[in-house]
């Protein structure tokens, strides 16, 4: 039984109430009684609106399902389909042209293009790593990944391999030549660096030279005649050459260079949503407490690395000498967003007088907004660090369907600002373009938040899940691997960029693109993810600090501002392309192809769900059926479960096929997790495993889940597991894993 405190019409879990009163409110100048009265009023006023929006989702889906069932096997008449979607209010009139008016936004969002990390906030170590990933070692990122092949004697090994190190150095020198070229010669031939008359002087074997563009010299540390680092800038991103002739690497370098540091994760999303498993008050408070520590600057995590124990804390800002003299400071940490949950879920952290749980999205806005106040100014109580230098709070809002839901979020933020005594529009919104009704009405969605919006982002993983569920009754969908080449998804990516630029995002807000999920395949990422900035994205998601440093290379190669200028005024996608349903043209799959698809998806589902339900791990590096590590979260789970639910609905497979595949894949997943002491095998007692049953339920009842979301089943099953574990002691739980080291 949860211990609760009554406040007005609400009953608040004691653990949350005490955290807010004793930890979150001190330092904000907000009276506790006034705050809780405001919470009570916001919940009372906005809960009916929230529920009405969910009802509208269900009503629209029911009408779409009915339309497709009536169509039977006839080809889709696109004109009739578009007219139908317009008549039911799914497809709305496009508003007149406009420009967003959001003000008070940090430069990391408005003008600096670069990588964006997403990290589970329930794991303090990962959150700290992500916040500190503003700056990353290029040498480490190259040496430790497959970007440098382990051939010709360049294996990693347990100790430093000079052959590999030399290849790293050569790669980095080539990067410098390409990004901040010298007026003559190459960084590869440099023998020293000095600063003379405010200019960088680079010594070569036979002469001295400088930068081809002297304006790319941004500063230095140490003495001008013998600097310990040289700071350069390209496309708004900083590059720092560290010089230490006595270091292990520096002793092998003619110029004494020991590393090249790149400005990497410019922004980071601290996530309360898809990458976490927060199902009750205790889980929510863990996340809120970590968010508080990040904003106050006092979050710390004990780390044991190679037998050495230390305390990880937030990095301080970085101090430099300007080329012409005088000191300046650069941020030492990534600018933080916080991702709240969407409109669907409730949480028992607060219940009303009837015992009904309060909508979690309303709670998140109130409590993450309150906590973020500590990141707006430094003080003895708030700590020495600040997040936003312009006084803004940045909240990513996911899984919104259409402009009415965006408008509701803006109203919620406005009401929260009143409760917190903040100026209107302090709380900015990042709009995830990851639901089909938002995509086809994106211009209207942006207009609904024109004075708050700071980013739009194509979440293609969730977006694919909604694409499948929306048209569940239309027929069997193409295989998961084929989905990325479908007309709708190509149009979707272009449409997002074009809509953002048309609304004036360039120089005002981020245009973002999705995650690289193959966490170990960094060479492939370096080869292919450059397509995102080339497409006009000013940021794109990466799964780790190392990936952020490597993806930063792309923003030196691509001038995103120039790309956006070239795309301005274009409209590359049509509504017909966006509405093209990814149906299989014919059921031409051989039985072994069907079995392969089912096994691949069942293995992926089991590999993710077993850690979610049994260990509370919301974001995992899950080996696929071929043992390739993939970053999995609820978005990838949504795709896999919805595709199989669709095939089940249309007779491509049977429930017996699903069960047989799950039973085949469970032992494989058990073997892949054999090294985890907290892991509980699913085989051979499948029906005794709550995780196995959750995976099965996600598929068999996938067609009936609201918009295909996995949260209702996951939350219920995780609570079931927690209740069972409370009755019978089990191995220790964990709040995160290795998704973002």
Curated annotation (Swiss-Prot):
Pfam families: MS_C, MS_N, MS_TIM-barrel, MSG_insertion
Biased composition (Basic and acidic residues): 722-741
Renumbered residue ranges of the record's region Disordered: 718-741
Catalytic function, reaction form: glyoxylate + acetyl-CoA + H2O = (S)-malate + CoA + H(+)
Pathway in which the depicted protein is active: Carbohydrate metabolism; glyoxylate cycle; (S)-malate from isocitrate: step 2/2
Localization terms from the record: Cytoplasm
InterPro entries, per the entry: Malate_synth_C_sf (IPR044856), Malate_synth_sf (IPR011076), Malate_synthase_TIM (IPR001465), Malate_synthG (IPR006253), MS_C (IPR048355), MS_N (IPR048356), MS_N_TIM-barrel_dom (IPR046363), MSG_insertion (IPR048357)
Alphabetical UniProt keywords: Cytoplasm, Glyoxylate bypass, Magnesium, Metal-binding, Oxidation, Transferase, Tricarboxylic acid cycle
EC number(s) given by UniProt: 2.3.3.9
Family to which the UniProt record says this protein belongs: Belongs to the malate synthase family. GlcB subfamily.
UniProt cross-references to NCBIfam families, sorted A to Z: malate_syn_G, PRK02999.1
Protein name: Malate synthase G
Upper taxonomic lineage: Bacteria, Bacillati, Actinomycetota, Actinomycetes, Mycobacteriales
